[in-house]
Amino acid sequence: MDTNNKDDSIIRFSVSLQQNLLDELDNRIIKNGYSSRSELVRDLIREKLVEDNWIEDSPDDKSKVAVLVVIYDHHQRELNQRMIDIQHASETHVLCTTHIHMDSHNCLETIILKGSSAEVQRLQLEIGGLRGVKFAKLTKASSFESNE
């Protein structure tokens, strides 16, 4: 396989699966509205590439980007200030935050982060461990070549 060929032509190849895996694949296609098995397989490969990109990170690579979604009780005393203090103290760059009031008790905040994978994940764990935080999920991202 020539990995240096970066054109955007589509290569057809075959995959052998047990029937139960094929059934599961087809169920996901229907459930998620994919137009074909190929579309689902491409998404699964991209997802794995992002995951591997985060695992293979070197401490000097500060280019990882992620979105941290936090739901918290805004009545929890000083929680908002502690979240801000953690963000300011972190080596991770906070690129943007968005804050919404979900209801009379809960706020949702999205925080777009850039930094090393270790530092970004550390920030997520720190914020997620605060009293009053009900949910903290990190969605990792990665850039792709234009033809991926």
Curated annotation (Swiss-Prot):
Highest taxon listed in the record's lineage: Bacteria
Cofactor stoichiometry and binding remark: Binds 1 nickel ion per subunit.
A Gene Ontology biological process term: response to nickel cation
Chain positions recorded as Ni(2+) binding sites: H88, H99, H101, C107
InterPro entries according to UniProt: Acetolactate_synth/TF_NikR_C, ACT-like_dom_sf, Arc_rbn_hlx_hlx, CopG, CopG/NikR_regulator, Ni_resp_reg_NikR, Ribbon_hlx_hlx, TF_NikR_Ni-bd_C
CC cofactor: Ni(2+)
Molecular functions per Gene Ontology: DNA binding; DNA-binding transcription factor activity; nickel cation binding
Pfam families, per the entry: NikR_C (PF08753), RHH_1 (PF01402)
Keyword Phosphoprotein among record annotations: no
Record bears the keyword Glycoprotein: no
Assigned protein family: Belongs to the transcriptional regulatory CopG/NikR family.
NCBIfam families: PRK00630.1, PRK01002.1, PRK02967.1, PRK04460.1
Record-given protein name: Putative nickel-responsive regulator
